[in-house]
UniProtKB/Swiss-Prot annotation:
Family per record: Belongs to the WD repeat HIR1 family.
WD repeat positions: 11-54, 64-103, 127-166, 169-208, 228-279, 299-340, 344-385
Role played: Acts as a component of the histone chaperone complex chromatin assembly factor 1 (CAF-1), which assembles histone octamers onto DNA during replication and repair. CAF-1 performs the first step of the nucleosome assembly process, bringing newly synthesized histones H3 and H4 to replicating DNA; histones H2A/H2B can bind to this chromatin precursor subsequent to DNA replication to complete the histone octamer.
Gene Ontology BP terms: DNA repair; DNA replication; DNA replication-dependent chromatin assembly; nucleosome assembly
Sites of Phosphothreonine modification: T394, T419, T433, T495, T509, T521, T531
GO cellular component, one term: CAF-1 complex
Name of this chain's protein: Chromatin assembly factor 1 subunit B
Amino acid sequence: MKVITCEIAWHNKEPVYSLDFQHGTAGRIHRLASAGVDTNVRIWKVEKGPDGKAIVEFLSNLARHTKAVNVVRFSPTGEILASGGDDAVILLWKVNDNKEPEQIAFQDEDEAQLNKENWTVVKTLRGHLEDVYDICWATDGNLMASASVDNTAIIWDVSKGQKISIFNEHKSYVQGVTWDPLGQYVATLSCDRVLRVYSIQKKRVAFNVSKMLSGIGAEGEARSYRMFHDDSMKSFFRRLSFTPDGSLLLTPAGCVESGENVMNTTYVFSRKNLKRPIAHLPCPGKATLAVRCCPVYFELRPVVETGVELMSLPYRLVFAVASEDSVLLYDTQQSFPFGYVSNIHYHTLSDISWSSDGAFLAISSTDGYCSFVTFEKDELGIPLKEKPVLNMRTPDTAKKTKSQTHRGSSPGPRPVEGTPASRTQDPSSPGTTPPQARQAPAPTVIRDPPSITPAVKSPLPGPSEEKTLQPSSQNTKAHPSRRVTLNTLQAWSKTTPRRINLTPLKTDTPPSSVPTSVISTPSTEEIQSETPGDAQGSPPELKRPRLDENKGGTESLDP
């Protein structure tokens, strides 16, 4: 695993808000789209150099938006690129095979001459009233969902360019949206602190998730806390994601309150019960803002001894969680991260994306730069020869049947073998196998290990009160020079930096030396129509000064 922050002025040194790798090209080319405050969408070619690091080449500048662009997403086939921005429109781009470039009023002639590819807008989707924050495609590429500052999410028929459904249950900005690969749900996450899961077939809310029980009060009343951060989060994105097989829903921007302590986390939901999480993945320091899954299915790691699994799948899936200042790498065979990347950017991260073969993980930041994590062949695992066949449902072909979602509470928690007794799990949920026989990755130099939140030794106890998280101030000038910290399992508990070679985790490694996730078992209250009860319910401020307040051309990059 290697990391490089490319010295490229991706968007004229303006903040980069989103990026996305093109899939469906059978590995012929790693094409990457990026978007930022400069109102442009840009296409890049990413290759792996002889030293294993990423090499980036400019391909095209797509100029049609009139305000900042917040999100770019390729369709599953890779033919169409969707972009959404502060101008409240969604543009659908496609490569123009004509040799003569299209005349665009928004693009300078000098910039157009640099283009190696010609992209043209094939459709413009108008329906949102305010900034578009997130976009996701259906698996077949015929439908699309978008999330906006106007408190709504819209389902689009891409071929007709028309709205199918408008979901307006949220009370504040909708900052993330994801499409179920099996075609049954669309999930949204808002700064009103509510996760809403919609039934695509019924076109209405199936689940509302907002609060979790924290214990019983002195007088016997049930106490609860809010599961998600309020609008004090420094990020304007909460990019949640289903796993490629649809078995899990991964939601960032989570927070766990235990007494006076507040822990940032990412919640893991099983599609068998989307009312409450089966686990949460603590993140040290800062709130999480994006989750993206590697599209490759991997073979299970061999194990030395059999234990109770947390996520029982016949294959292994890998996903990345981005916080405000770091990226953690997880897989479905264990509940703690196997990789950690930090200290690569001066400002808040904004988006992450995997290449189709899992060789690259791209990271964008509001400091105007992007980084790449590269993986050698089979470093993440041995890919399956054939992907599993998904049993998809579409609005046109799905039968109107009763919901198959479990409506009762799951059996009580029980200890997981080979882990601290206080770590419990829902037996109906997917499982994980302890990675005693994990293959050793390539040797890596470990420097300045960060302080990691210790594992919680008991289920979340006692009554808790709602807390408002205050964003920490940033001082760019006082930040030290960039450096990359790659942490894997054996470096988490070290207190002083030292050079070591990575070796597989031994069977006798004490549990206290490994950061573990907390398996959440209390029930979640289902809220049918709720107005957030926190005192500070005002919308967040604008992301940044508008473009007309920060005019400036392309600047040469300092070495």
